[in-house]
Amino acid sequence: MNSRVHQGHFARKRFGQNFLNDQYIIDSIVNAIHPQRGEAVVEIGPGLGALTEPVGERLDNMTVVELDRDLAARLQTHPFLGPKLTIFQQDAMTFDFAALAQEKGQPLRVFGNLPYNISTPLMFHLFSYVGAIKDMHFMLQKEVVNRLVAGPGSKAYGRLTVMAQYYCQVIPVLEVPPESFTPAPKVDSAVVRLMPYAQPPHPVNDIRALSRITTEAFGKRRKTLRNSLGHLFTVDVLAEMNIDPTLRAENITVAQYCQLANWLTAHPQPQEN
């Protein structure tokens, strides 16, 4: 049988589909999520239901967001899951999680085996809804999880790290080998838990400033701050904040990036003509 066919469904490469089939890993993920009746649980990309079924067994109802119309149709007619599911056949990148949380009257518990080809932009989409989310559990490419949990000074530390750790407490849960999937991906995977802060430890006054600074600093990560952010902060301003201008983007802590963002918000740059 073609290695891309699983349970009669042909894995669509353009959707980044790899289906989880390792029962030990499935049980470990479900136990980590620990779904409870009465909670507003949302799965992104349920696929063939490897996680949907065991999670759904513990719930009276749940919401799924599935782009693939064939998979959405399969879930709709699932013998015991079907009646429990509210299915949105759409791209999670366009899904309004705040509207769903408002409808449910409580913050959402979101989980999923995310398609690796869109995992990073999808994480940024979800960060814009953290006020509507209680927690998130995701299977991701191990390299992405390493970036989420990285500390300053490591090669994995980047813009995704800073933004994720600004919004959430990030906790690695378990590693998942390629053979746990059909078809087996060429990379290792891992599960991560993200718990949005009720109040960020280092609040910023305008998130757009933090987004801009991290984009520009890590866009030139081999340059020193004097060069990558020199158009925004003078050496003297950096010194006032006890930030060494000879350091690179990967050496600056989340707290320091937040400090820079608040300074920039308080000292708006003149508009260019």
From Swiss-Prot:
Gene3D superfamilies: Ribosomal RNA adenine dimethylase-like, domain 2 (1.10.8.100), Vaccinia Virus protein VP39 (3.40.50.150). S-adenosyl-L-methionine binds at residues 18, 20, 45, 66, 91, 113. One of its GO terms (molecular function) is 16S rRNA (adenine(1518)-N(6)/adenine(1519)-N(6))-dimethyltransferase activity. It catalyses: adenosine(1518)/adenosine(1519) in 16S rRNA + 4 S-adenosyl-L-methionine = N(6)-dimethyladenosine(1518)/N(6)-dimethyladenosine(1519) in 16S rRNA + 4 S-adenosyl-L-homocysteine + 4 H(+). SUPFAM superfamilies: S-adenosyl-L-methionine-dependent methyltransferases (SSF53335). It is an enzyme of class 2 (transferase). It holds the Pfam family RrnaAD. Keywords: Cytoplasm, Methyltransferase, RNA-binding, rRNA processing, S-adenosyl-L-methionine, Transferase. InterPro entries: KsgA/Erm, rRNA_Ade_diMease-like_C, rRNA_Ade_Mease_Trfase_CS, rRNA_Ade_methylase_Trfase_N, rRNA_adenine_dimethylase, SAM-dependent_MTases_sf. GO terms for cellular component: cytosol. Its EC number is 2.1.1.182. It is found in: Cytoplasm. Belongs to the class I-like SAM-binding methyltransferase superfamily. rRNA adenine N(6)-methyltransferase family. RsmA subfamily. NCBIfam families: ksgA. Specifically dimethylates two adjacent adenosines (A1518 and A1519) in the loop of a conserved hairpin near the 3'-end of 16S rRNA in the 30S particle. May play a critical role in biogenesis of 30S subunits. This is Ribosomal RNA small subunit methyltransferase A. It comes from Erwinia tasmaniensis (strain DSM 17950 / CFBP 7177 / CIP 109463 / NCPPB 4357 / Et1/99). The gene is rsmA.
